[in-house]
Amino acid sequence: MTQIRRGFYGPRVVAFGGGHGLSASLSALRLMTQNVTAVVTVADDGGSSGRLREEFGVLPPGDMRMALSALCDDGEWGQTWRDVLQHRFMSEGPMNGHALGNLLILALWEHFGESVTALDWVGQLLDIKGRVLPMSSTPLEIEAVVDGDGGRTTVRGQVAVATSTGHVHHVAVIPKNPPAQAEALVAVEEADWVILGPGSWYTSVIPHLLVPELREVLRTTKAKRALTLNLNAEKETQGMSAADHIR
């Protein structure tokens, strides 16, 4: 299954990010190349993803589900499976709020015992234009030091950091120095372009640079690199200029 995406045409593009920002980037990139690889953050701790992560001890699947959906084509097959993958159950019971795609990814992870093979199988089912990979094989936590009205505090968790109203002074991932997904390193090394963002700056973009192997391959790759910033500032980047993002 790891070889099913060879032979694509167009430039080799790797997109870093997570959530809605990465989804928007992938929706545009798939119109320009079929050789696109999404490298997705694995620190989500909210909603359906957070519940599955806590209960099963797996990578949070939600951002990968969104990336897979974004790479579906515009035909009936692609759009039907996109909608099915994104479908959320509404009930009074424990299934409430779960996305079907999260459950499908979880089932394939348990079946294969390996995340990349499972994601490739979902990609084949959806006939996506590209590939989706986790940035690390280990679920991560985000921890930030935030300067707010009450002084400097430490905030832990993707949701908590993303909704923080203070100025983020420092951000880290736990565990420290996590392993990068091997296939992601190869994709960056062989890429023509690497795109960072758009998305939540401290919780979807910066975490990729806190994985030492990813940071190093991004530094040494011969690929051109582009940074895409959000059109509107989020709470975690309120008051930051474009230059502030790259200092």
What are these regions (language model features)?
Residues 41-166, 172:
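Electropositive, gly/pro-rich neighborhoods at or near active sites that engage anionic ligands
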Residues 1-62:
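Gly/lys/ser-thr-rich phosphate-binding loops in alpha/beta enzymes
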Residues 187, 210-221:
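Catalytic-core regions built around general acid/base machinery
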Residues 170-185, 209-210:
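Active-site glycine-rich loop that binds ribose-phosphate moieties when present
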Residues 191:
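An anion/phosphate-binding loop that grips the pyrophosphate of nucleotide cofactors and donors
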Residues 33-34, 220-225:
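A short helix->loop->beta-strand "cap" motif at the edges of active sites that frequently abuts
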Residues 201-212:
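Glycine/threonine-rich flexible loop motifs
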Residues 2, 242-247:
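C-terminal functional extensions of proteins
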